């Protein structure tokens, strides 16, 4: 059985996070349903981590196993025809049997955006925190210094 890696990006506004839930629409389940239509059998998607409800992912890695003969380079096109516009498979490739998106993840990067203006911009809705008051850049710079360097976030990670 092949082990296939998918490089995804998605807008999480309409989803209750990555992880499959019994009664909620999730990114993983939406992707599984699309993959099942393409490969012709049930699949289980493993993701590189959980995202919360409403969270977006610009570069997200998932993997699944299949014995379908669809070439990996054709999978993005095939999957994207069965996915909503807010989930896109950017690329796919075959990998070794031992790869698992969550267990093989070596790095995560989070971006938090502040839209600082007196007037809201609809293009930033669900993509940035709207803050209409004056920002104290000195305080922000001082806070940002705490993140410079290498840190052990083991106490707050989920993997």
Say what each PLM segment does:
Residues 1-159:
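Structured-RNA-binding interfaces characteristic of tRNA pseudouridine synthases
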């Amino acid at each position: 059985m092949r082990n296939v890696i998918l490089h995804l990006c998605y807008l999480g506004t309409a989803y209750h996070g990555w992880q499959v839930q019994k009664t909620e629409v999730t990114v993983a389940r939406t992707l599984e349903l699309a993959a099942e239509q393409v490969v012709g059998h049930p699949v289980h998607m493993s993701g590189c981590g959980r995202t919360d409800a409403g969270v977006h992912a610009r570069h997200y890695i998932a993997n699944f196993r299949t014995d379908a003969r669809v070439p990996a380079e054709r999978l993005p096109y095939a999957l994207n025809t069965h996915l909503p516009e807010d989930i896109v498979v950017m690329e796919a490739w075959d990998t070794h049997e031992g790869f698992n998106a969550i267990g093989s993840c070596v790095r995560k990067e989070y971006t938090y955006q502040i839209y600082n203006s007196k007037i809201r911009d609809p293009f930033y809705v669900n993509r940035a925190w709207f803050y209409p008051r004056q920002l104290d850049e000195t305080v922000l710079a001082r806070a940002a210094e705490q993140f410079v360097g290498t840190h052990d976030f083991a106490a707050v990670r989920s993997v």
